[in-house]
Design a protein with these regions (language model features):
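Extracytoplasmic/periplasmic membrane-proximal domains and adjacent transmembrane bundles
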Residues: 1, 69, 347, 354-534, ...
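Hydrophobic transmembrane alpha-helices and their membrane-interface caps
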Residues: 4, 8-12, 16-73, 540-623, ...
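Transmembrane alpha-helices and their membrane-interface boundaries in multi-pass membrane transporters
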Residues: 39, 47, 58-72, 94-113, ...
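Transmembrane helices with small-residue packing motifs
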Residues: 39-45, 112-120, 198, 203-241, ...
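Helix-loop junctions and hydrophobic alpha-helical segments within the transmembrane domains
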Residues: 69, 74-102, 181, 524, ...
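Signature of alpha-helical transmembrane segments and their immediate interfacial
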Residues: 93, 162-221, 622, 700-701
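Extracytoplasmic/periplasmic
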Residues: 220-291, 343-376
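Solvent-exposed, membrane-proximal periplasmic/extracellular interface segments of envelope transport
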Residues: 245-329, 386-405
C-alpha cells in the first residue's frame, strides 16, 4: 500500500518515466538491505521491528532520488538530451542531497545505539533504515542517472491511458503552480517583510504546543501498555497453601471467566459465547495460568472481559499473586521499593501505600513482597523430660512421624511405585492444639503427654527477609490501566500528594520508584546522550557543504518545530507520547533538515551569482518548492498506511510513525517560511556587525 501511494505521488508531479525509475530504485535498496541482514553482516531477522524499518524507509529513501531525478530531467530538457547534461544535472544537487542523507543516517545510527532492553529492540529498525539510506546514495547518484541518461525529454503527445495521465499531471501541476503563485509567494513575501514578527509567532506556537503534554492535553506514558490478543490470568499461591488449593482456585477462576462472558453477552443483547478457546494450565501445586481467546465476532472487547473477570473473582484463598490482564506491558508496571532499619516502619508504610493505591482509579492487582509469616512451634525439653530420658532428637523424630508420617512399605501398581505412609488421621493433625495434645513414648515404652516432657512456644516467622544496603526492604507493585492513568501520572501524583507526608511521618524510611520509573530513567539518560551526539553529527555534516557555522544552526531550527508537528500529530490522533514516540522524534531530527539544506544551498548559489538578498531568498524558496513538497509528501504517504492500521502488531509502530509523518509535514512549513525569515535576520545582524566594524575602523583610523 505504501509503495503504491509513493509511486502515485511521484507520478502526479514528475514525468511518468522519471517517476518509474525513481520508484524502481526501491527494490535495489530493499534487496540490498536484505542481503546485509544475513549472518555474514548484521545477522538480523525479518520481524515486526525490521519490517517497520523498511516501511519507515519507504518514503525517506526516495527523497534524494526525487531531487536528483527532477534536476537531471530539467537540465536535459533545457540544454539537451546529452550525457554531459545528465552529469551536470546530477552534480548540481549531488552535495546537498548527499549530506542530507548523511544527516539522516547520523540520527538513525544514533537510534540503533540506545541502551536498555527496549532500546536494543528499537535499534533494529534504526539499523534497517541506516542500511537503506546508504544504499539509496548509491542508487540515486550512480544507478538513477544511468537510467535517466537514455530518457528522451522531448516526446510527442500521447493518446489513450498515457494521454489521460498527462492530463491528470497537467491538472496536478496547475494546482501546484496556483498554490505557488496565489498562496505561497504572497505569504512568503509577508513573512520575509515582517520577519521578526513571524519568528515571534513561530516561537509562541512552539511554546503553546510544547505545553500540551504538561497540561495533560497530550498524555504521557513512557512505556504504554498495548492491546493483546488474549486475556490471561496468572495465579501464584503461597508455599504453605493446602493440598488441592491450586486446582480449586483454577476451577473457580474458570467458572468466573465463563460467568463474565455470559454477563457481557447478555448486556450486549447477543447470543452464544464470545470465547473461542479457554486453556487452563497448572504448573505444579502453587501456580497456574488460564488463557482465553475471543471469537472474531464477539460483541465485547478483551478489556471488558478482563475488567469483569477481575470484578467477579475478588480475593482467593491462599493466593500470593493473581493478575488478570488483556494488555501486553513492555516493562514492569508500577513498583516502589521501601527500605528502613525498623521493621514496624516498613509494615506501616507498606499498609499506607496499598491503601492509597486502592483508592486510585485504574490501579489494580496491588501486591506486596511482605508475605504473611509462617506459624512456628518451638519445643524445649523440660527438666522433668530430661530426667525421664527424653532428648531433642528423639522428640523431633516422634513428632515428625506422627504428623508427617513414616514410609513403612513400597510396592508397584501399574508400573508406578506406591508408598504406604503411617501417620495420625487427618482430623488429628490439622490444628496446633492437636500437637499440644499428642502423646510421646519414653525409652522404657511408657506413653506420656507432650506437655510433661517439653514446653511449647508458638511464634510467627517471616518466610524471607530482604536487605538492601543493610536495610530491611520490601516492594509494593501494581498493574495500571493506562486508559485511566499511566504509570508516569501515578508516580507524579504520589510524589506530589502522598510521598512527602509519608517521609515526614516515618523519617527512617527511604523509598525508590522502580519498575517502569526505573526503566524510564535509564532509557531517557541513554536517549539524551544519543540525541546530543546526533545533533553534533548533524551540525558537523551541515557545516561541511555550507562552509558556515551559522547556517547549520538556522537549518537545525527545523528540528524543534518538527517535534511540534509530532506532538500535534499525537494530539489529533488521540495518541500518548511514549518511548515509541521519542524514537520517531529522534529519527525525525535527521530527516527534517534535508529540505532546509536544499533551500539554503540554492540560496547560497544565487547569492554567489550576485542576486539581491530578498530576491535570492524568494527565488530559492519558489524554485525548491516542488522538491520540498514532493519529498515531504512521499515520506508522509509512505507512513500513512501504518497510521490507519488497527492490528495488534501495529500498535507498537503507530506512535513512531506519527512522530515522523506529522513532524515532517509541519517541518515543511518551517522550511518554507521560518528558514527564509531566519536567513534574512542573520544577514541583518551580519550587516549591522559589518557597519559597526567599519565605524570603529574609521574612528580609530
Amino acid at each position: 500500500m505504501g509503495i503504491a501511494l509513493v509511486f502515485v505521488t511521484l507520478a502526479l508531479f514528475l514525468n511518468l518515466r522519471v517517476a518509474f525509475w525513481v520508484a524502481a530504485g526501491l527494490p535495489f535498496i530493499f534487496f540490498g538491505t536484505l542481503y546485509f541482514m544475513t549472518d555474514s553482516y548484521t545477522n538480523m531477522t525479518l520481524n515486526e521491528m525490521t519490517t517497520f524499518g523498511f516501511i519507515m524507509a519507504l518514503g525517506i529513501v526516495v527523497d534524494d532520488a526525487v531531487v536528483v531525478g527532477e534536476s537531471v530531467y530539467a537540465t536535459r530538457k533545457q540544454y539537451g538530451d546529452t550525457l554531459q547534461n545528465t552529469i551536470a544535472g546530477t552534480h548540481k544537487v549531488a552535495i546537498p542531497t548527499l549530506f542530507g542523507v548523511l544527516t539522516t543516517v547520523a540520527t538513525f545510527f544514533a537510534l540503533s545505539n540506545v541502551s536498555g532492553g527496549l532500546g536494543t529492540l528499537y535499534s533494529q529498525f534504526g539499523t534497517i533504515v541506516t542500511l537503506c539510506l546508504l544504499l539509496s546514495v548509491v542508487e540515486s547518484k550512480l544507478i538513477l542517472p544511468a537510467h535517466l541518461a537514455h530518457l528522451p525529454t522531448k516526446t510527442t503527445p500521447k493518446k489513450g491511458i498515457a494521454g489521460l495521465w498527462n492530463k491528470v499531471q497537467g491538472k496536478a501541476d496547475a494546482g501546484l503552480q496556483w498554490f505557488n503563485y496565489r498562496l505561497y509567494q504572497p505569504l512568503l513575501k509577508v513573512t520575509v517583510t515582517y520577519r521578526y514578527a513571524a519568528v515571534l509567532l513561530f516561537i509562541a506556537l512552539f511554546v503553546v504546543v510544547m505545553s500540551l503534554p504538561l497540561t495533560g492535553a497530550v498524555r504521557v506514558s513512557f512505556f504504554p501498555s498495548m492491546q493483546g490478543d488474549t486475556v490471561t490470568a496468572n495465579l501464584s499461591l503461597y508455599s504453605d497453601a493446602s493440598f488441592g488449593q491450586n486446582e480449586r482456585n483454577l476451577l473457580l477462576l474458570e467458572q468466573n471467566a465463563l460467568e463474565a462472558d455470559r454477563q457481557l453477552i447478555a448486556e450486549k443483547g447477543a447470543e452464544g459465547s464470545g470465547i473461542s478457546s479457554l486453556q487452563v494450565t497448572a504448573s505444579g501445586d502453587q501456580s497456574g495460568t488460564i488463557t482465553i481467546s475471543l471469537d472474531e465476532s464477539q460483541p465485547y472487547s478483551l478489556d471488558e472481559l478482563s475488567a469483569r473477570w477481575n470484578a467477579l473473582t475478588g480475593t482467593l484463598e491462599g493466593v500470593k499473586s493473581l493478575k488478570i490482564r488483556s494488555r501486553r506491558e513492555m516493562v514492569d508496571g508500577f513498583k516502589v521499593e521501601l527500605k528502613s532499619i525498623n521493621e514496624d516502619t516498613l509494615i506501616a508504610a507498606n499498609t499506607a501505600f496499598q491503601e492509597v493505591l486502592e483508592d486510585i482509579d485504574g490501579v489494580y492487582a496491588i501486591e506486596s513482597s511482605l508475605t504473611p509469616g509462617e506459624a512456628m512451634m518451638r519445643f524445649e525439653i523440660t527438666p522433668q523430660g530430661r530426667a525421664l530420658g527424653m532428648d531433642t532428637q528423639s522428640l523431633s523424630q516422634q513428632l515428625l512421624k506422627a504428623f508427617g508420617g513414616e514410609i513403612v512399605q513400597r510396592y508397584l501398581r501399574d508400573k508406578n511405585e506406591v508408598k504406604v505412609r503411617v501417620r495420625y488421621p487427618e482430623e488429628d493433625r490439622m490444628n496446633p492444639s492437636d500437637v499440644m495434645n499428642t502423646q510421646v513414648r519414653l525409652d522404657d515404652g511408657t506413653v506420656v503427654p507432650l506437655s510433661v516432657v517439653a514446653t511449647v512456644f508458638q511464634d510467627v516467622q517471616q518466610k524471607q527477609v530482604v536487605r538492601i544496603d543493610g536495610l530491611r526492604a520490601l516492594t509494593v507493585s501494581a498493574s495500571v490501566d493506562s486508559d485511566i492513568i499511566t504509570s508516569t501520572e501515578l508516580v507524579n501524583y504520589l510524589n506530589e500528594s502522598f510521598v512527602p507526608q509519608l517521609e515526614k511521618q516515618y523519617q527512617d524510611l527511604s523509598l525508590y520508584f522502580a519498575g517502569e520509573a526505573e526503566q524510564q530513567a535509564e532509557t531517557q539518560s541513554s536517549m539524551q546522550s544519543v540525541f546530543i551526539l546526533a545533533l553534533l553529527s548533524i551540525f558537523a555534516l551541515l557545516a561541511i557543504p555550507l562552509k558556515s557555522y551559522i547556517q547549520p544552526l538556522i537549518i537545525m531550527t527545523a528540528i524543534p518545530f518538527g517535534i511540534v508537528g509530532a506532538i500535534i500529530g499525537h494530539w489529533s490522533n488521540g495518541l500518548m507520547l511514549s518511548l515509541l514516540s521519542l524514537n520517531g522524534i529522534l529519527a525525525l531530527s535527521g530527516v527534517v533538515v534535508n529540505d532546509s539544506l536544499l533551500l539554503v544551498s540554492r540560496f547560497n548559489a544565487l547569492r554567489r551569482e550576485g542576486m539581491a538578498l530578498e530576491n535570492a531568498v524568494i527565488e530559492a524558496c519558489t524554485s525548491r518548492l516542488r522538491a520540498v513538497l514532493l519529498t515531504s509528501i512521499t515520506t508522509f504517504v509512505g507512513l500513512y498506511p501504518i497510521l490507519g492500521e488497527t492490528s495488534i502488531q501495529a500498535q507498537f509502530l503507530i506512535p513512531a510513525a506519527a512522530s515522523l509523518g506529522y513532524g515532517i509535514l509541519f517541518a515543511t512549513a518551517i522550511t518554507l517560511l521560518l528558514i527564509p525569515a531566519l536567513l534574512l535576520i542573520y544577514e541583518d545582524v551580519a550587516g549591522i556587525g559589518a557597519r559597526a566594524k567599519k565605524s570603529v575602523l574609521r574612528v580609530t583610523g
